[in-house]
From Swiss-Prot:
Statement: the UniProt record of this protein carries the keyword Nucleus: yes
Main location class: nucleus
Top-level taxon in the UniProt lineage: Eukaryota
Residue ranges occupied by any Bms1-type G domain in the UniProt entry: 83-243
Biased composition (Acidic residues): 376-409
Role this protein plays: Required during maturation of the 40S ribosomal subunit in the nucleolus.
Species for this entry: Caenorhabditis elegans
Protein's recorded name: Pre-rRNA-processing protein TSR1 homolog
Swiss-Prot/TrEMBL keywords: Nucleus, Ribosome biogenesis
Entry's transmembrane regions: none
GO cellular component: nucleolus
Stated family: Belongs to the TRAFAC class translation factor GTPase superfamily. Bms1-like GTPase family. TSR1 subfamily.
One GO process term, biological-process aspect: endonucleolytic cleavage of tricistronic rRNA transcript (SSU-rRNA, 5.8S rRNA, LSU-rRNA)
Start-end of Basic residues biased regions: 9-25
Gene designation: tag-151
Length: 785
């Protein structure tokens, strides 16, 4: 065996050397070459993420400081909040009654001191050194339930052991959830009385499944049968972490326990509302909202004797002025009074005057030119304007069906959606015309889905006159549209922010009264104190209206929130509403926006990116949309509930959502599609007919681009003859089955019919889900027949 190894020959090539200049360099080489200079990527990363430029110890110190600040804020809130914890008790299904449930809680501890007020049941619990106030609104009164939840710290649901909810319970849960939820505690009365452990766990899991289905809470359910269970429940109500609503975190509010009238002068008086001061520090310069009546000014806030003390005091404290308004308080001006003379008046030119003299008038036979000059034509002008408004603002109903006769106003209102499904289904005196009107609405919605925005060109008047307010766009996405062009007179009455985001940021930064030295801002030590709020210039009728109100909640307004503007809301149609909802000026909706309730007309538009948005003639079923109304300014986020109401006062939940912004410059464009038929096709040259019916209209709309459903693009070359045929040219050859389309656009605005809504709701005014579904099936059968 040879002991010598292999030796390379003379033809052996050496290994390639490592090329350090190719590929990635080491960190050390990069650092030495940069000499402290940072690249573009590093600069961009540092601008968006500051924690990358600091050390690990510095980041750890920042987290510790933020954690300590949160703990200090929590301790400050506990130290300064002296108001009792408000708990709203809502019973679902056939469970225990709220009053019986509260009576059992009162018997779990002998030291509990129970007092009552017109709106609450109050517990003073020396064992826990705390106070709890219970609200028991009637679940059949939706307004009462929502008002109680807006002011509550905890929402306590009493679930039935069967875990079965009625249609009304599901409807109520939907409204409550859309309105916003505070901290939730779920209680099952009778759960502890089940002896069989397996059966008890099955009941618990069934109820927890229903709770998770509604996405209410993950804390589980609690029994409320024994003394131990009730004590544990009271402890949880006191010590659980409170999650305030956005409404409560931004606005100072008060649950009114006593209402009095003082300094009565004529039809107005000074309203004295007594209750606990809750939320951020009260400011006497800010306005206060009275539900159903509007916004009013505050003169002063005084401390009063607490009617539900934790410990009885022998000495009665004297009344003390907590805050007093000054010359900086907000006024109650909600809109601007427009000046009709504030505008440029352009005098007509000589050519326009000569053209006006050539105007032809219809006069009786045998009338001379001198007599014809004295005939007034105001009525003709009004008729022409009315017909134009009917065509533009009522979805071109006259254009869509020329043979349809003019209907009375009652029928038009029924088409606008003011007849609820429950009225159709369950009234004994049912009217066949109303049924057919509902079927007609379904047909129109189906036609709009199949041929969106398509309109027949009128034959009795020129198209350039019928669509004189419309214009063509080269591209809906990229073409420009001036938001300040051709604004209605109502825009002179509203307010607009120069920069909405900056204004909102400044307003939110001042929440809580940073100017503590001002006499108009209450000190933090008075948070939760029982006080009297003096509201000036309130009509005397308000006291009579609130005589029977149990859950009256006052909210203070932020700056600018009393001013009228254009409010945009992102909504989604509720599944329980299956009837078509049109977007026209005859349909008014009831909106619950935060603590406000008002009626207004809305314009529906698409919720898409861009600077222009397409009008939705019908409320979309599956996707979200934006409703635009004239309403007081409300800073987002804020919850929105949308209802529709018939002439008998019955209401139906239509849509839910939140506030988008307050922007009058939002451009909502109504699209009208004119369709024609390709008469002769010669490769890319096509003769189109039935789109227009005279030569002048073809020349007028010649600059507008044409298209087909298959994606072909073209333009008008010239008119052929005098009966509306025109020669067109497209980018590719057309099929005989294609239709030629032309898009026209017009900006639309909502109608100014804002009014404060001041009626309490009841279950007879709501349409339950099962009834609506059955009615939709009946209407579908009627359409198929």
């Amino acid at each position: 065996m040879s002991t010598t190894g292999h030796r390379a020959g003379v033809f052996k090539k050496p290994s390639k050397p490592h090329k350090s200049w190719k590929g990635k360099r080491t960190k050390g080489e990069i650092t030495s070459e940069n000499r402290g200079r940072e690249g573009v990527k590093q600069l961009t990363r540092s601008a968006h993420s500051t924690h990358r430029t600091i050390s690990k110890d510095a980041r750890r110190n920042q987290l510790k400081m933020a954690r300590d600040q949160k703990m200090a804020d929590a301790m400050e809130r506990r130290r300064t909040s002296n108001a009792p914890c408000l708990v709203t008790v809502v019973s679902l299904g056939v469970g225990a009654r709220p009053t019986e449930f509260i009576k059992k809680l009162a018997t779990c501890d002998e030291t509990i001191i129970q007092t009552t007020s017109p709106s609450t049941i109050d517990f003073a619990i020396p064992r826990f050194k705390s106070r709890v106030s219970f609200l028991t609104p009637d679940k059949d009164n939706v307004d009462g339930v929502l008002d109680a939840i807006r002011a509550s710290d905890v929402l306590c649901f009493l679930w039935p052991m069967s875990a079965e909810l009625s249609e009304w319970d599901e409807q109520l849960l939907t409204i409550i959830k859309a309105n916003g939820l505070p901290t939730i505690v779920s209680v099952v009365p009778g759960l502890g009385s089940i002896a069989n452990h397996k059966k008890k766990e099955d009941v618990r899991k069934g109820i927890e499944f229903i709770i998770s289905k509604w996405s209410m809470s993950n804390a589980g359910v609690m029994p409320a049968d024994s003394v131990t269970d009730n004590l544990q429940l009271l402890r949880i109500l006191n010590e659980t972490k409170k999650k305030p609503l956005t409404l409560q975190a931004r606005h100072s509010y008060m649950l009114v326990e006593n209402l009095e009238c003082s300094d009565k002068t004529g039809e107005t008086c000074t309203l004295v509302a007594q209750g606990y001061l809750r939320g951020p520090e009260w400011n006497a310069n800010n306005l206060v909202h009275l539900p159903g009546f509007g916004d009013f000014q505050i003169s002063k806030i005084e401390s009063t004797v607490d009617p539900h003390p934790l410990k009885a005091h022998n000495k009665t404290p004297e009344a003390q002025i907590i805050a007093k308004s000054d010359d900086k308080r907000q006024n109650t001006e909600t809109e601007i009074t427009p000046d009709s003379m504030d505008g440029e008046q352009t005098w007509p030119t000589r050519e326009e005057l000569e053209e006006a003299d050539k105007e032809l008038r219809r006069v009786p036979k045998g009338t001379s030119s001198y007599q014809a000059a004295w005939i007034l034509d105001d009525e003709d002008d009004e008729d022409e304007e009315d017909s134009d408004e009917d065509m533009d603002d009522s979805d071109n109903e006259e254009v869509e069906d020329d043979s349809e006769e003019e209907e009375p106003m009652d029928d038009l209102k029924s088409e606008a959606g003011e007849t609820t499904a429950s009225e159709m289904m369950f009234d004994d005196g049912i009217d066949e015309d109303i049924n057919m009107a509902e079927v007609e609405k379904y047909r129109k919605e189906r036609e709009n889905a199949q041929w969106p925005d398509e309109v027949d060109t009128p034959m009795d008047m020129p198209a350039r006159i019928a669509f004189q307010k419309y214009r063509g766009l080269k591209s809906f996405r990229t073409s420009t549209w001036d938001p300040k062009e051709n604004l209605p007179l109502d825009y002179a009455r509203i307010f607009q922010f120069a920069n909405y985001r900056n204004t909102k940021k400044n307003v939110m930064s001042k929440i809580g009264g940073n100017d503590v030295d001002a006499d108009s801002v209450a000190d933090k030590k008075f948070n939760g104190a029982f006080a009297s709020v003096f509201i000036e210039n309130v009509p005397v009728a308000v006291l009579e209206a609130y005589k029977d109100a149990k859950n009256l909640v006052l909210f203070q307004l932020l700056p600018h929130e009393h001013k009228m503007s254009v409010l945009n809301m992102v909504l989604k149609k509720h599944p329980s509403c299956t009837i078509p909802i049109t977007s026209d000026q005859n349909q008014k909706f009831i909106f619950y926006v935060g603590f406000r309730q008002f009626e207004a007309n809305a314009v529906f538009s698409s919720n898409t990116p861009g600077d222009k948005f397409k009008l939705e003639r019908f409320m979309p079923t599956e996707k979200t949309f934006v409703a635009t109304v004239y309403a007081p300014i409300t800073f987002n986020p804020a919850t929105v509930l949308c209802f529709r109401q018939d002439d008998k006062g019955r209401q139906e939940l239509v849509a839910t959502g939140s506030i988008l912004d307050s922007n009058p410059d939002r451009i909502v464009l109504k699209r009208t599609v004119l369709a024609g038929h390709p008469y002769k096709i010669n490769r890319r040259a096509v003769v189109v007919r039935y789109m227009f019916f005279n030569r002048e209209d073809i020349e007028w709309f010649k600059p507008v681009e044409l298209y087909t459903p298959s994606g072909r693009r073209g333009h008008i070359k010239e008119a052929v003859g005098t009966h509306g045929n025109m020669k067109c040219r497209f980018d590719q050859q057309l099929n005989a089955q294609d239709s030629v389309m032309l898009n026209l656009y017009k900006r639309v605005f909502p109608v100014w019919n804002y009014s404060i809504f001041n009626r309490s709701l009841n279950p007879s005014r709501f349409v339950e889900r099962s009834r609506v579904e059955s009615i939709s099936l009946v209407n579908e059968d009627a359409m198929e027949e």
